[in-house]
Amino acid sequence: MAISSSSCLGLICSLLCHWVGTASSLNLEDPNVCSHWESYSVTVQESYPHPFDQIYYTSCTDILNWFKCTRHRISYRTAYRHGEKTMYRRKSQCCPGFYESRDMCVPHCADKCVHGRCIAPNTCQCEPGWGGTNCSSACDGDHWGPHCSSRCQCKNRALCNPITGACHCAAGYRGWRCEDRCEQGTYGNDCHQRCQCQNGATCDHITGECRCSPGYTGAFCEDLCPPGKHGPHCEQRCPCQNGGVCHHVTGECSCPSGWMGTVCGQPCPEGRFGKNCSQECQCHNGGTCDAATGQCHCSPGYTGERCQDECPVGSYGVRCAEACRCVNGGKCYHVSGTCLCEAGFSGELCEARLCPEGLYGIKCDKRCPCHLDNTHSCHPMSGECGCKPGWSGLYCNETCSPGFYGEACQQICSCQNGADCDSVTGRCACAPGFKGTDCSTPCPLGRYGINCSSRCGCKNDAVCSPVDGSCICKAGWHGVDCSIRCPSGTWGFGCNLTCQCLNGGACNTLDGTCTCAPGWRGAKCEFPCQDGTYGLNCAERCDCSHADGCHPTTGHCRCLPGWSGVHCDSVCAEGRWGPNCSLPCYCKNGASCSPDDGICECAPGFRGTTCQRICSPGFYGHRCSQTCPQCVHSSGPCHHITGLCDCLPGFTGALCNEVCPSGRFGKNCAGVCTCTNNGTCNPIDRSCQCYPGWIGSDCSQPCPPAHWGPNCIHTCNCHNGAFCSAYDGECKCTPGWTGLYCTQRCPLGFYGKDCALICQCQNGADCDHISGQCTCRTGFMGRHCEQKCPAGTYGYGCRQICDCLNNSTCDHITGTCYCSPGWKGARCDQAGVIIVGNLNSLSRTSTALPADSYQIGAIAGIVVLVLVVLFLLALFIIYRHKQKRKESSMPAVTYTPAMRVINADYTIAETLPHSNGGNANSHYFTNPSYHTLSQCATSPHVNNRDRMTIAKSKNNQLFVNLKNVNPGKRGTLVDCTGTLPADWKQGGYLNELGAFGLDRSYMGKSLKDLGKNSEYNSSTCSLSSSENPYATIKDPPALLPKSSECGYVEMKSPARRDSPYAEINNSTPANRNVYEVEPTVSVVQGVFSNSGHVTQDPYDLPKNSHIPCHYDLLPVRDSSSSPKREDGGGSNSTSSNSTSSSSSSSE
């Protein structure tokens, strides 16, 4: 039983908590901690196998239930239940005589140790110079140490400490009693000084003088003997050769790598290397070893540190430096580079295709179904399409799915940011705004468009879109390139906000603040200047004497009745002065005379004696004392009277700091713009800045076809009829296409506009990516290819007429005839008793099973009964006698339908002629447990009513016994045993043979050719790589049909592996896929007469297989209800039937 993960987690948590709790109280590593174990219970969840009744179906002879029988078996599923588990935990406490102090257990003394410490229960350890049970008594002068129990015993003139008992030794001595010399390496008083002698030299224990070991010299023996010298005092000469180094002490030679001997005079023998040749070379496969380094120099075809590896695929020769040149799937021999071609190819480099271009098959009579423009090869045997890079599908008619490219669309695109990936090269076509090999780098500032090739034209610090170059203007600017200020009355981002300024106030295009015209004030310029003030910002004060204030803009005094003059200070009429206002004034430009002296008082904007001159440039107003404001876009200084600015064309406002309102242009904004289609009008010269996608003086003309963007300067990159947006160049794909530039077909299973429609095609049909129209596979028809060919037709488009006779059925794909009971042959036109399956004597051979004839013995009834009975009785006695001596047996085999095949190859079957005119039988079996191939022994007395009994054992293996073989029917049988080559698996045969276990170097050879090879003489070996539990049985050649024509079709979809019937054990369901189980072509008579024909759906899910030929059939299991033999072989028949019955019951 298993404990669930949640229970385990709870158990671990409880143990952890207990450990933490214990650890927090006592240190378990304390030697004074004692512990004991206590038990406790926890609830856990545990799993157990729960039995249940499982129903399944097997093939049987029950014709009423269509040959299906229900079976029951007991199976188990995992269930869970709660249970209690006893756990143990350790509990810790202080040992007796100890008590707990913090996390330690300390000893307890009843009497406190005064000058000592408690080291054990009721035991004190006194400090030196003290004694007594509680260390409270001091030692007398004759004793020392703990408890005053020791006497001084110092030697070598050492002094004894009466309290500590320590001896103060003389220089060069040590020890408790100073009886020992200083340890090696120390000397002097208390041996505290360390000797400085090196390299094993000895030191005088009193003075520290060094006495050097052999091989060293110097005051501290720190130097080795000079090169070429060794021994005591470095007086001896070294004899080493070949760069050998002499040991400075012994003079022994240390040889360099590759040399050996007393004086390093001998090179390493072969197979050895390294220092003193002590290491053994580890080079394999004929590699040689460098005597110095041990590095392997590999023989041609091998590599690796020890030459243990063959050259990687695609290389050969010395150091694997040569590149293989084999084409068309040919395998390159790693030593010489010789090409081992796949079936269907030949030539030194496998460059020659056996079939003409466009054809394939055994007879090169089938036309390749590949789309030629997208295909680089059509396999000459299987017809499999080898797609060019960028294409996939059965017929190379599908582009790579988005995100994949290259050979077989197996490589993953690295493109980022919505880039298109070239399905052939994988090169990235970046979306506008990105660049780089993988389109991961955004455009730098100032660049935009495809590959960032265009330069931004935005002005006034506007942000340029890296995609289409459109400008995102800062506040206060607008236009295609952000070169135009916001029109009068607008401000902010996009000039979308309306100014709130009144009375001619100018609006700041950035923040909307108002700059008031002269004479006005307030946040919105809604208030006139206060009484007594006038001018810009109401900063000037009125200079009037008898007036009702002054004009808020000009400061002109509004005189009270009876008063006149510039300052309203004269009682004379306008133009008079002096006594009784009798003198005329000569002042000009509205000036007044002083009533006293006639001096001219000039009106605002004028100056001079008679006020005939205007203010100097830059000044205006009363007495020309006011300074002109900063006119932004003006043709000159301000007006000498009002102070207003004279604006340039396109500008307006008191300070000429406002652009003409939208739709107006020119001097005083008097002109009307004519721009259309959202074009921006230049307020100065009326020119139009067109919106992307439009051109012309008034932006009324759209971009020409295949152009887009501002002024239509960019060229569209859309393909396959896609519509290109004139604004941003975006491609609007036509139905059936997708991708950034509409270069990719709809993914598999989709079609139509935006690839949004789901294909409805069935049975592996191709779906047109534009219209969704289905192109049916061979054997199907209908709008969605949902219908099989009508009865009597088959093939592509169901245009071919079946040629099957005698009520036989026709395969709707291949036209293969499925014969009615009692018939055989390619067209079911032969009355048959023997059914043979043969596809290829070398590639794949199906089992041929004998059957009883309904008519044998009919002619014998005409003969005189007495003579016939006597004759048959004699034959029967002879047969029984021979049969007892024969006792031939066959090894156990496991059948597979040999249909789960990839790239299977065909070779025309041949037979070996025998000396007596018969055919030599190459009868063989394949079995995972048997690698020995057995052939049947010759039997001179064989009844032509031969039978093959098939019984199923308890371990589900099939055992086959060939009995009563007729020499005339089956040819002379040779008793021999062939064994597989020793390197069958190790030499790579398993990978080279293909799905049928055939070395392709033997493809196309006859059995006669193979028979000449001594290694394979008298044996035919088969090694199946199929995953099915049935292997192939090759029957005697006499059972082969005269014609070897076989139905053949290429199906490449993968086989289903998840079906509960993917492997055959005890039954063959009615819906068995014909590509997983070979169809029963004809009903076997005699012992198999109740088997019947099983209706199957052979095209449930096709895969890359070869359709069986007309004579392929399943191994049929014997039934307990079958009739007994007609030849009187009762014992054999009974034995066979009983064996079959036991097999059935075992299920």
UniProtKB/Swiss-Prot annotation:
PTM info: Ubiquitinated; mono- and polyubiquitinated forms are detected.
Cytoplasmic compartment spans: 879-1147
Domain of life: Eukaryota
One GO cellular component term noted in the UniProt record for this chain: plasma membrane
An individual GO BP term: myoblast development
Region (Disordered): 1093-1147
Extracellular topology ranges: 26-857
Keywords: Cell adhesion, Cell membrane, Cell projection, Disulfide bond, EGF-like domain, Glycoprotein, Membrane, Myogenesis, Phagocytosis, Phosphoprotein, Repeat, Signal, Transmembrane, Transmembrane helix, Ubl conjugation
Tissues where the protein occurs: Expressed in cerebellum (at protein level). Expressed in kidney, stellate cells of the cerebellum and macrophage cell lines.
Membrane topology of this protein: Single-pass type I membrane protein
Composition-biased stretches (Low complexity): 1132-1147
Region (Necessary for formation of large intracellular vacuoles): 945-1147
Signal keyword on record: yes
Xref: PROSITE patterns: EGF_1 (PS00022), EGF_2 (PS01186), EGF_3 (PS50026), EMI (PS51041)
Disulphide bond pairs: C34-C95, C60-C69, C94-C105, C109-C124, C126-C135, C148-C160, C154-C167, C169-C178, C191-C203, C197-C210, C212-C221, C234-C246, C240-C253, C255-C264, C281-C289, C283-C296, C298-C307, C320-C332, C326-C339, C341-C350, C409-C421, C415-C428, C430-C439, C456-C464, C458-C471, C473-C482, C495-C507, C501-C514, C516-C525, C542-C550, C544-C557, C559-C568, C581-C593, C587-C600, C602-C611, C669-C681, C675-C688, C690-C699, C716-C724, C718-C731, C733-C742, C755-C767, C761-C774, C776-C785, C802-C810, C804-C817, C819-C828
Recorded phenotype for the gene knockout or disruption: Mutants show at postnatal day 7 an increased amount of apoptotic cells in the developing cerebellum. However, adult brains do not show higher numbers of apoptotic cells in the cerebellum compared to wild-type. Astrocytes from knockout mice as well as heterozygous mice have a significant impairment in engulfment of apoptotic cells. Reduced proliferation of primary myoblasts. Mutants have normal mobility and their skeletal muscles show mildly increased endomysial connective tissue. They display reduced motor activity after exercise and show slower muscle regeneration.
UniProt keyword Oxidoreductase, yes or no: no
A molecular function GO annotation: complement component C1q complex binding
Domain EGF-like: 101-136, 144-179, 187-222, 230-265, 278-308, 316-351, 405-440, 453-483, 491-526, 539-569, 577-612, 665-700, 713-743, 751-786, 799-829
Signal sequence range: 1-25
Glycan-modified residues: N134, N496
Free-text note regarding domains: The EMI and EGF-like domains work in concert to promote self-assembly.
Role summary: Membrane receptor involved in phagocytosis by macrophages and astrocytes of apoptotic cells. Receptor for C1q, an eat-me signal, that binds phosphatidylserine expressed on the surface of apoptotic cells. Cooperates with ABCA1 within the process of engulfment. Promotes the formation of large intracellular vacuoles and may be responsible for the uptake of amyloid-beta peptides. Necessary for astrocyte-dependent apoptotic neuron clearance in the developing cerebellum. Plays a role in muscle cell proliferation, adhesion and motility. Is also an essential factor in the regulation of myogenesis.
Family: Belongs to the MEGF family.
Protein name: Multiple epidermal growth factor-like domains protein 10
